[in-house]
Amino acid sequence: MRLGIKEIQEIIPHRHPFLLIDFIDELEPGVRAVGYKSITFNEPQFNGHFPGQPVMPGVLMIEALAQVGAVAILSLPENKGKTAFFGSINNAKFKQMVLPGDRLKLECEIIKRKGPIGVGKAVATNAEGKIAVSAELTLSLIHI
């Protein structure tokens, strides 16, 4: 199932400039999602990270992965209207710099769910298939 920006915004509350997914290419509600993010020089973080040598901040790559995980878990009918918040970020590993012009494939598989908590195994790869970042993300689902 493919989701564009409009469908993504119906599931998660993030908006510009903090919506870090361009589209979802694969979705199994409650199980996994695969999304993509094209990195462009015009993004606001590159004004200061780093002037003359722009590099995508690792925390924003983690956030993009969490947004994909949130789409996966919040796409379940019983989670409609909830928001996913970080519970924890474990075993984060940053392996490749991500630069303007790169395209990230963002994958998150929900490996455990218990009540309002979901744990996702998340990996972002570049166009060459090299892992840029991986982490285990715990998301807490809350009505706000």
Features from the language model and the residues they span:
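Short beta-strand edge segments in extracellular beta-sheet folds
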Residues: T138-S140
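Beta-strand-rich interaction surfaces with strong enrichment in secreted/lumenal proteins
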Residues: Q9, G52, F94-Q96
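Active-site helix/loop of acyl-thioester processing domains in fatty-acid/polyketide metabolism
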Residues: I24, M56-N79
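Conserved small/polar residues in nucleotide/adenosyl-binding loops
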Residues: I142-I144
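Hydrophobic beta-strand-centered segment that forms part of the acyl-chain substrate-binding groove
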Residues: M1-R2, G69-K105, A132, E136
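Short aromatic-glycine motifs in intrinsically disordered, low-complexity regions
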Residues: I5-R15
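Hydrophobic beta-sheet segments that form the core/acyl-binding groove
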Residues: I24, N90-A127
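Catalytic strand-loop segment that frames the active site of acyl-thioester-processing enzymes
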Residues: H16-M56
